[in-house]
From Swiss-Prot:
The keyword Cell membrane does not apply. It is an enzyme of class 3 (hydrolase). PANTHER family: BIFUNCTIONAL DTTP/UTP PYROPHOSPHATASE/METHYLTRANSFERASE PROTEIN-RELATED (PTHR43213), BIFUNCTIONAL DTTP_UTP PYROPHOSPHATASE_METHYLTRANSFERASE PROTEIN-RELATED (PTHR43213:SF5). GO terms for molecular function: dTTP diphosphatase activity; nucleoside triphosphate diphosphatase activity; UTP diphosphatase activity. GO terms for cellular component: cytoplasm. It comes from Shewanella oneidensis (strain ATCC 700550 / JCM 31522 / CIP 106686 / LMG 19005 / NCIMB 14063 / MR-1). This is dTTP/UTP pyrophosphatase. It comes from the Bacteria. Keywords: Cytoplasm, Hydrolase, Nucleotide metabolism. SUPFAM superfamilies: ITPase-like. Belongs to the Maf family. YhdE subfamily. Gene3D superfamilies: 3.90.950.10. It is found in: Cytoplasm.
Length: 194
């Protein structure tokens, strides 16, 4: 099987590379699936993130029609606060609003991973509880000025400057980054890829 990552995220690419544990025979391609990420009316966060991961994997599979036996990995990450999905910010003001909402509180990060081939799609969902320290307006302004939050669900990246705001996590660190390693390895192992 030929492994394909249906994402152009540098964070997901780096994490998937780790799964190979440095083996030269662990390789993968990347494609950029284009899907509608709009939540459906009444859709629960768990259902939403799993649907997007599956749709990304299926859209990636469609982009690999010229490849022999593709196995496509799709993933999506959301931040949930009081059952509200906090996606990527639309502008600086939105990022600041989200960071103020997260300040001093716990929230859930959900990452779904789907592995699709021509016959089957397998799925894993991982949830991690993240608690933020209290953020000052100066912290929020400086962080947003760095532009780091602008392409990240929940307006922060735990692996970057945003990690300074994380008081504690209960669960998978790699889930918060965007690709839960243990569960992704399980999917790849079950499919005979590793």
């Amino acid at each position: 099987m030929n492994l394909v990552l249906a994402s152009t995220s540098p964070r997901r690419k780096e994490l998937l590379t780790h799964i190979g544990l440095g083996r030269s025979d662990f390789t993968f391609e990347q494609v950029a699936p284009d899907i509608d990420e709009t939540p459906r009316s009444g859709e629960l966060p768990r259902d939403y993130v799993q649907r997007l991961a599956a749709e990304k994997a299926q859209a990636g599979l469609a982009l690999c029609s010229d490849m022999s036996q593709p196995a496509v990995l799709g993933s999506d990450t959301i931040v949930v606060l009081e059952n509200e999905i906090l996606g990527k910010p639309v502008d600086d003001a939105d990022a600041k609003r989200v960071l103020r909402a997260l300040s001093g509180r716990a929230h859930t990060v959900m990452t779904a991973v789907a592995l699709a081939n021509a016959n089957h799609t397998a799925m894993r969902l991982v949830e991690t509880l993240v608690r933020f320290c209290v953020l000052s307006d100066a912290d929020i302004d400086a962080y947003v000025a760095s532009q780091e939050p602008m392409d990240k669900a929940g307006s922060y990246g735990i692996q970057g400057l945003g990690g300074c705001f994380v008081e504690s996590i209960d669960g998978s660190y790699s889930c918060v980054v965007g690709l839960p390693l243990v569960e992704t390895r399980q999917l790849l192992s079950e499919a005979g890829i590793i």
